[in-house]
Amino acid sequence: MDSQVPNNNESLNRFNDIIQSLPARTRLTICSLCLLDNISTQLLRFLILNANSPNIIAVLTDQTAFLSSGETEIFQTLVKLFKQIRMIYHTRSPLLSVHDVAPGLWFPNSPPPLILRGHEAFIITAIRKANLLTFLLTSLNCLNYGFELLQSIFLDIFCPNTNTVGNNSLEQSGKFLKSQAILYLDLKTQAYIAGLKEFQDETNEISLEKKQELLDLIFPSNLADILVQRRTGDSGDITLLTPSEKDFVERCDRRRENLKIVQDFNSLTQSYEWAQFIRELLDYCNKNMGLIIWGRKGRGKSPLYDFDVNEFDPQVLFSTGTRTVEFMDDQNQPSSASAFLSTARPNHYSTHTPTTDVSSKNPAITQSIVDAAVAASMSNSSSGPHSSHNNSSNSNNNGSIGLRKPKAKRTWSKEEEEALVEGLKEVGPSWSKILDLYGPGGKITENLKNRTQVQLKDKARNWKLQYLKSGKPLPDYLIKVTGNLEKIYKAKKKFSQSPNSSTIMEQNLSQHPSSAASATEDTQTHQEDSHGQNSDNMPSNGLFGNSTSDNTGFDPHLEDGM
């Protein structure tokens, strides 16, 4: 099979040689897979390209504010097409399996039939794209499945099991990574908040009885048994927990206790923002698309732009028999809280978006945001994932509207600064360990739950530079933090002496005199939003990447806006 991206004709005709001898129903499901893959890919590109812009996604997915023109129509049309194509596959579960695509031919937890040999990688890729899209669209309230589905299929989407055919043993295919555990923890938290939405009134006081009922449902006491049984098929032996699973259970216990003491609904939504969760979810998908779809890291390739069978993990072929609850016909809910979660919908930013985000209410801003977002989407769809930076630069040079993130910069609170200082004193500049102590489900507090490793390093480095510039004695906890004035000054001097640097700056200022300040602000905001987790060997996209020197891209005045 050709390892490159097939052209349209090749993609649509890939099954022509085998379908003639198949039943009519099977022919329909197999032939429709190419269309399902195409629609899923376009929708995933729309969402992933705007991962850091929650207002843009809110505009695209808001069915009640349908624009008469613009690219929201394109997005909503694609969503409708996705729903229609999904109806071709007679499945009682929201997730597709190989049995839905090839009924009577390919059964879950079984090798592909001979007639489909050579096509299995494409089939699994299309199924996984569709299932991931189902998860994301449900999260964005475009599909009405609710939080019960999101909780139950999270592990099936991001780290499915593998049934090793031949010896009837179960092996772990997708490792339960720390970044996945934090996402799962935050998803459970958002499900808890959605269950309490009825208390969003004048008093905002949460009922203790309702709180306890939801906590018992979402953070069950037998969570360890559930994880072990899912992975091994056996229950009762929690000693079989992997280190990452054990860490997740401990984080859930701590998060449960922290949620239990919050009495005010508004305080809950401010501490655990829905928009922040969506940003982190889409950012993880963007950085780990190869792992989610192909079962292994794509070595610089993305399934949204490339189809390479050499990147595909063969073991993924047998991880298609996910045991999901059949939500469509399930009428035996164990409790009222469980019944509520099956219908509870994500809040779609309505109560979680900061008050400074007003673009979705302003038609002019809305139109410019959507136009810029989809312009980036269209240019990337034809050029591949590595051309987004160049396309963005070209659009700015041509004077077109740039894609700016319409969110206010998150100011460091006193509690966050104190937690960072304590973390530096305890473990030094080990940012992952600091987040283990003070991050999501932290062992001490969760004061840094909304901060990334890059942001911690930025903040500590700016503190150190402030002390060095003022001549004050440097605290012991900042001594090992990287950064010194000499390297900063050398970097500035090198830039000022570089050819054409002043000319380029003057040209940019003359062409866009009103955008100079906003460009600096956007750069800093991007650095704040970059995720510094050690996720899946992706290239570092922050200020302090593994391959960058101490002075690369650093702004010594960053602290002024922090």
From Swiss-Prot:
Ranges of compositional bias, category Low complexity: 377-400
Chief location bin: nucleus
Q: Which GO terms describe its biological process?
A: chromatin remodeling; negative regulation of telomere maintenance via telomerase; snoRNA transcription by RNA polymerase II; telomere maintenance via telomere lengthening
Q: Where is the composition biased (Polar residues)?
A: 496-522, 532-552
Database matches in CDD domains: SANT_TRF (cd11660)
Q: Which PROSITE patterns match?
A: HTH_MYB
Any single GO molecular-function term of the entry would be:
chromatin insulator sequence binding
Q: So which domain of life are we looking at? A: Eukaryota
Q: Keyword Zinc-finger: yes or no? A: no
The terms describing its cellular component in GO are: chromosome, telomeric region; nucleus
Localization per record: Nucleus; Chromosome, Telomere
Q: Which sections of the sequence are annotated for DNA binding?
A: 431-456
SUPFAM superfamilies the record matches: Homeodomain-like
Which keywords accompany this UniProt record? Cell cycle, Chromosome, DNA-binding, Nucleus, Telomere, Transcription, Transcription regulation
Q: Which InterPro entries match?
A: Homeodomain-like_sf, Myb_dom, SANT/Myb, Telomere_rpt-bd_fac_dimer_dom, Telomeric_DNA-bd_trans-reg
Q: Which residues form the HTH myb-type domain?
A: 404-460
- Region of interest (Disordered), residue spans: 376-414, 495-562
One matching Pfam family is: Myb_DNA-binding
Assembly with partners or alone:
Homodimer.
Other comment? Present with 6380 molecules/cell in log phase SD medium.
Please describe what this protein does: Binds the telomeric double-stranded TTAGGG repeat and negatively regulates telomere length. Involved in the regulation of gene expression. 52 binding sites have been identified, distributed over 15 chromosomes. A member of the general regulatory factors (GRFs) which act as genome partitioners. Acts as a chromatin insulator which are known as STARs (Subtelomeric anti-silencing region). STARs prevent negative or positive transcription influence by extending across chromatin to a promoter.
Designated name of the protein: Protein TBF1
Please give the organism. Saccharomyces cerevisiae (strain ATCC 204508 / S288c)
